[in-house]
Amino acid sequence: MTNKKRHIAILLGDPSGIGPELVSKLLSQNELDQANIIVIGEKNILENGNKITGNSHNLNFVEKFEEINFEKGNKFFLDISKGKNINYKLSECSAESGETVLNALNYALDLTKSNKIHAINFAPYNKTSMKLAGRDRKSVV
């Protein structure tokens, strides 16, 4: 990591909950300029949060961590959707929501283990959705 700023991953949380809205609001904070921010998730989930808040953000979108170049900016969105575009229903637990949360969390943990990011910040998760996706509470971080 050549850049002196810390690399912080922000996870969108449960796509059916308040997480995407909270992340949308967080991305508007000037304090984030003190770090390199990598939002990890599915693009359509952040867009749903932006619709609720009325915010838009100047993020650089990438599909692989290796595509990130902090000389081009300090806020990136790492889209891990792999082309899927699920329409998550708000306030409704589902295995799909839980799977999305677990995919983002596992991706961020792998980046942390390989020293590519320094910290993970995550919006609220729904343990019921995570359990529907095949995880019990004991195995959740």
Predicted regions and their residues:
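Contiguous, glycine/small-aliphatic-enriched amphipathic segments in soluble metabolic enzymes
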Residues: M1-R137
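Conserved small/polar residues in nucleotide/adenosyl-binding loops
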Residues: V140-V141
